[in-house]
Amino acid sequence: MKKYTKKIKQWHKVLDINNVYNSNKRKNITKKKVCYKNTNISRICESAKYTTYTDQLYNKDNVVIVNNYVSQIDNKFKKYRKYKIPMDKRTHYMVDKIKNMNALDTKHKNLIINDFYNYVNLQWMKEIVIEDEPKYYVEVDNFRIIQEKVFYQLVKYVKDYIKKHKTSKKAIAIKNVYNSMVTESTTKMNNHVKQILDFIDDTFNVKTKTNIYDVLSAINSNEIISWGSPIQWQLLPDEKNVTKYISHLSMAKLSIYDYLIYIDDPSDTLETKKYKAYVKKHFFIYLNHLFALYEPINSDKKNHKYNPQDIWDVELELLTVMGCNSNMTNNIYNSVSAHELEREYNFNWTEFAQKLGYKEIPKRIIVSNLSALKCTIKLIKEKWNTPKWKTYWVYIYLRQLSRFNNKDRKIYFNFFKKILHGSPVDMPDEIYPITGLSLCFNTFLTEQYKENNNNQLYVDYTEHLCNDLLTLFYYKIHRNTWLDPSTKKAALKKLLKLKLIVGSPEKIREDPIFDYKSDDPWYNMLLLIDWKHKQYLSLEGKDLIDIPRIDWEHFKLTGTQSYIVNAFYMPTSNSIYIPLAYLQPPFIDLKERGLEYNLAFIGYTIAHELSHCFDANGSKFDENGNLNDWWTKNDKLEYQKKIKDVINQYETFAKRDGIEFDAAIGVSESLADISGMSLIEEYLRDVLVIDRDIDIIRRTNLKKLYYYLAIQGKQKIYKNAIKSQLKINPHPLEKYRVNCPLSRLPLFKAIFDIKKGDGMWWNNEESIW
């Protein structure tokens, strides 16, 4: 027996389940005792044969589904017969194709060894011209395409439900929310703007005896606008006791994501200066258009009283205090008492909390940055009621309110999406209401999506593969050589307690039904936001519940909605969530594809999320999801060396294409890519060894895996969006997400004869773990 095979069998001796469970040697298993201490891990061990399909996967219910798949062959044959190439000429057609491919392989030998991603996706990139059919998302890939499809499905379910239940209270409420966001509502918006202006005028009136806490509490009571507050309040899980909610205070988010644009730097190149001037010019155009929208501000339709420069100046002031120098700690987690906030930071927490609506004042608060908090409070107390800041308060409201009127949102799109992000077109009117519907009717949308799309076979398969890969990752960490014993022990403990959620959360709250209006979207959102805010206030210090979250800056679903096409590792709960919407082709395909394909798609996603347990951020949290420093000093230093090498690799690969970017921004994603790709390669490698395939089959199957990995990463980005994506996207460009991890795999380099000096060569073959 070859040494390689012996080593494999030693690593996976525990997988010989029959011998283990049917003998009296169970007590003698020492290194693998973990399999019997935890029922979840025990189940993993029982199923972890490292094969695609097992008896456990195809239970009685699933056998029926699988048999139904067989009947679809007839339908596919009908399509096959109608294919544009006559049946009697198809062999010759394929012969010609193969000859051409062989010629291309010789011609493109340099491309294979220098840019594997482009070699595999060359044909696709030539055929797909994204400018011909512009999309509202700048990255055209499987994730966005399928998410768009899901949005249209949800809208169809909504319309079908309304049609079927015309007179029900829920159907009427859903219909009103949807219609309000697809129809023009300028008159209603003008009324809301007047109310906002009246509130701000009253706040600035010395006779009303109001102060900065009236403004801050009002803004923070509305989550749609609170992200723009100079001091943002949120109720979130306590990072050091994640089973309980606690109040958090964080600092401002500015309008423009690239904060350097606000700063005049003498060392800027001419190109940089032109770009900064271009952005500032269009930002001012946007602001003038925004203030000109509403009659209470611009009654004569010609001039308004607000100066865009005021907003620029205020945001520059906020940027300055966010980076102010102080001897105080800049840790992201700072637990302070209400008394400390008031005495040391001059922030009247008691008054602020009372005006937020708290009946019992929270005693402790988590602050993201103490230095920035102190400087921000000093600034806003001095200037909050100046004319410049009054303009800023109005802007915070109007920026978000305008996005809920079907006509007005085009102005927001023209600057924030088109100029800043390079988006060619806005989100279609028909699916734009999804964010509002998700806020108001998340449970309804979840139930509808599950009813129409749940595929138990895919759920079972994904759970099975999750457990297999989790077990394999456990063994990989177990044999790690650079972690100190105490760090390794904590890492293994974290994997043992990792929770896997596939499909949708087990418990979700009922949707409240309000008297929504069909022509007033802002009113509708305020109804739900006010209700939700009161719910949050009642949760201070209490156990967590499932609350669907929305990123209101980007109108993006960020919670555990089952209709999100993505997967997540959540460090504060030490869990991986794979929504139901992700369990569909091309991400998983058990009808027509084999192990290599599914490993490269759903398998790679799972392995990637598993690796986030220990990335630059996930490594700060322990097995319970609590913020906890469980690393030794030596391990931290060693890990930083590895991170530095990863950053260097991604920047080096990009420079070859003339692209310069800061790879540190997305290093956590890069670490997860490198570790995840290595994990699924090891999974397939072990399957091939255990199945005793001959070497030529092993090589062929591994090649298929690498090809599919490149295919799953295929993506095109609109030219105008590349610059912004390099600055704000935590994920590097897909080309480097494929090529960089592959270049670290010894098997990949051996199979494709990659040598030092080739573009696909990297001197470091570490998979991090």
Model-derived regions, located:
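Extracellular/luminal recognition modules and glycoprotein regions
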Residues: 83-143
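Extracellular mucin-like PTS segments
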Residues: 46-54, 59, 65, 71
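Active-site rim elements
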Residues: 100-105, 261-276, 459-460, 650-668
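Arg/Lys-rich, intrinsically disordered low-complexity tails that mediate electrostatic binding
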Residues: 1-16, 20-42, 49, 78-79
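Hydrophobic/aromatic-rich, well-ordered segments within soluble, folded domains that form packed cores
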Residues: 105-126, 267-291, 677-679
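Intrinsically disordered, low-complexity linker/terminal regions across diverse proteins
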Residues: 92, 317, 321, 332-361, ...
